[in-house]
Amino acid sequence: MRKLLIGILALMLVMGYALAGAETLRVGMECNYAPFNWTQTEPGEYAVPIKDGGGYADGYDVQIARIVAEQLGMELEIVKTEWDGLPLGLMSGKFDAIIAGMSPTQERKLSIDFTVPYYESDLVIVVLKDGPYAQATSLADFAGARITGQLNTFHYSVIDQIPGVNKQTALENFTAMIVALASGRIDGYVSERPGALSAMISNPEFSFAAFEDGQGFETLAEDITVAVGLQKGSPLLDRINEILEGISEDERVKM
């Protein structure tokens, strides 16, 4: 009975959230992290207009956001925000949720709440297909390599696990890392596998090094999963958890 009452209360809070004028679910994302989220100039079947112009957002995160908004009975609004500004934007009320390929790390949990994960991946290093590291199968193979990662992400911090690495300055976003690799300024950058595959589609001269068991990065489960970020104490948390848990594996693959 107690669990039932708690569930009813949570539902009432969410309904109250909508009735109080929050008819739109404002979602913050970078719109620059394919295949999770990106910006395009033309509308598409599943693309969503970005607030205040600037094109349309699409990608895996956008499809998750569409499902969440639909099942909450709310309109979806995408708020394009630089990666570093996402937590602050959420806490300041600029948007209601972060759906941006963000991992629920312990550090982030100090300031915002996270839902259950909606995606899980692994870490690879994106390299030139014809470069000296294309056949690498272990971190040790990258000794002396110039490697970077995105600023303020755990992708950058794990570079320290590479023996003898020539760690480069962190770059602001994946576009900057792609340009740096293509121009030869770096030998590789750390990415999750989906991001690496997306980069290869746009840049056929790219490849990526995946690692044999025990030869790759040591990571925590929270580092390689992706979840929705919410304000501390958000009434949306339980309901969004239910929605995410209701998305079948088949639906996730099709997205």
Where are the language model's segments positioned?
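Ligand-binding clefts/hinges and TM-proximal coupling segments of bilobed small-molecule sensing domains
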Residues: 75, 154-171, 208-212, 241-255
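Flexible hinge/capping segments at coil-to-helix
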Residues: 46, 128-146
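Periplasmic-binding protein-like
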Residues: 32, 119-129, 201-244
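Bacterial N-terminal signal peptides
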Residues: 7-16
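Hydrophobic residues within well-ordered alpha-helices
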Residues: 68, 90-91, 125, 142, ...
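Short amphipathic alpha-helical coupling segments at ligand-binding clamshell hinges
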Residues: 64, 138-141, 192, 231-246
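Extracytoplasmic small-molecule ligand-binding "clamshell" domains
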Residues: 23-102, 110
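A ligand-binding cleft/hinge motif common to bilobed small-molecule-binding domains
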Residues: 84-88, 101-111, 157-161, 175, ...
